Amino acid sequence: MGFTDKQEALVRDSWEFMKQDIPQLSLRFFSLILEIAPVAKNMFSFLKDSDELPENNPKLRAHAVKVFKMTCESAIQLREKGEVVVGETTLKYLGSIHLQKRVADPHFEVVKEALLRTVKEATGNKWKDEMKEAWSEAYDQLASAIKAEMHAEAAA
């Protein structure tokens, strides 16, 4: 079916609202990833040997903002382009790093759950099943693009 006009509007409107608080929402997003899957901590060089709270770790904060913004902004592009558009070099890098870290399907599901919970918390009473479906579709498209690049690199 693809990404509909209505889904795009839901993602775009909620993203415009969330952009006001990117640093805090990004930290919440990453905290949820670590809460859902504590072993994920070992996948990040800046977290491996650290017991610091996420909000006190500047490398985590910077990474969280980058990941959260890219995820949300690629969702916005989905309707415009009909596919997730991430720069070719960025996509190659994402595929490469995810392959190196041995990221598997369950890891993508953890990130998806954390993203959906973050958006739900941020949007409050605006959160509905339709919004959940829109963000799910957008995230699934981004994850598929990263996985395709991972497979391409593994086959090379």
From Swiss-Prot:
Cofactor(s) this protein requires: heme b
Reactions catalysed according to its record: Fe(III)-heme b-[protein] + nitric oxide + H2O = Fe(II)-heme b-[protein] + nitrite + 2 H(+)
GO cellular component labels: cytoplasm; nucleus
InterPro entries linked: Globin, Globin-like_sf, Globin/Proto, Leghaemoglobin-like, Leghaemoglobin_Fe_BS
Site (Homodimerization) residue list: 132
Main localization of the protein described in the UniProt heading: cytoplasm
Keywords: Cytoplasm, Heme, Iron, Metal-binding, Nucleus, Oxidoreductase
Any GO molecular function: metal ion binding
Globin domain: residues covered: 2-151
Record: residues binding heme b: 45, 59, 63, 98
Cysteines paired by S-S bonds: none
E.C. no: 1.7.2.-
Localization of this protein: Cytoplasm; Nucleus
Keyword Cytoplasm: yes
Enzyme class: oxidoreductase
Sequence motif: Homodimerization, positions: 35-39, 105-117
Domain of life: Eukaryota
Subunit structure: Homodimer.
PANTHER family listed in its UniProt record: LEGHEMOGLOBIN-RELATED, NON-SYMBIOTIC HEMOGLOBIN 2
Name of this protein: Anaerobic nitrite reductase HB2
Lineage: Eukaryota, Viridiplantae, Streptophyta, Embryophyta, Tracheophyta
